[in-house]
């Protein structure tokens, strides 16, 4: 059977999908994809997989794809990051029997992508990208697709898209932000760029960016002429977005937990999803946020979900008619709704330099100066000191800089003291080292 291409691929293999769930690291796992499909998603992507690791590590393949699919999870596109044509194709060949297409990630703007030379940081290397797409197009039995970010210039973005199409890309997802637009500096995605790409290419185009509700989906399709719309953050905060519904936050959480019992995933994924779903409620009920951060089993998570449901129902019962939601929210905290990322503060480093670091999730805490992992540990161990300025100071070894022994006669650490004692045939009672002859 000949490989489907372009619009035939979109209409037949993908069923003319218009509502698409984005590839999200540690977030678009099988259980979440199944939940999204129950509520209107017509196509899903796997989380981004590293092609090089996928090729060399059988356990990575098993855990991240082979055991993370099921018959109901179709159509499905597997996404890879790569910067070597042969490695990309080898990984794709190992994955193609489990999906309907292979996607090359050309949109990740994070610093880890810059260090690894993949994602949006390949967008200037057109010769390399042509070779990667062409080789995949020639050797795979399924189509190859791409997810890109735009350039500031519309005409360069159009030429970029046309280059990928000419190389063999059969479907293009365009995120209407540049690689510099991320975190607090994300701003608004440019549908004008997406519209220009759609007019200039002869393959299906999906739009990504500024999608918070079903009305945004419909408006985006109408304004840009794209074949479908991809949602990431909007989907995480309301998996029923494509249905045009805004259910109670515990309703979708309980449904998701039921799916996880059938299709297990790491508890960290579950916790991250619930932090998103319950974002606004956890601002009201801080204790539940701390409990969610500490639980170590799925049943513990379910107990927190039940407690949250009871708290929300009590809030609903106390709600007076005609009172508006607090903090200018579009709905009360117990209703699934979009999260509006705050912009940079006036005079902040991000605002003045144009550079931004990935923002910590607000639900993880607001202790400045701590890493994301430290924040998680702080929530689990509230009495432990994580501030480096409050930790005890140790005098340093005169030679290597490690902490010295408090009773060492040479002011050295154990290792340096032992070497000196052997060299000089000397004693150090502090390190219980006696070498001087009696």
Curated annotation (Swiss-Prot):
Catalyzes the synthesis of dihydrouridine, a modified base found in the D-loop of most tRNAs. Specifically modifies U16 and U17 in cytoplasmic tRNAs. Affects the level of some mature tRNA and thereby the total cellular translation. It comes from Rattus norvegicus. Gene3D superfamilies: Aldolase class I (3.20.20.70). The gene is Dus1l. The active site is at residue 108. This is tRNA-dihydrouridine(16/17) synthase [NAD(P)(+)]-like. It holds the Pfam family Dus. GO terms for molecular function: flavin adenine dinucleotide binding; tRNA dihydrouridine synthase activity; tRNA-dihydrouridine16 synthase activity; tRNA-dihydrouridine17 synthase activity. SUPFAM superfamilies: FMN-linked oxidoreductases (SSF51395).
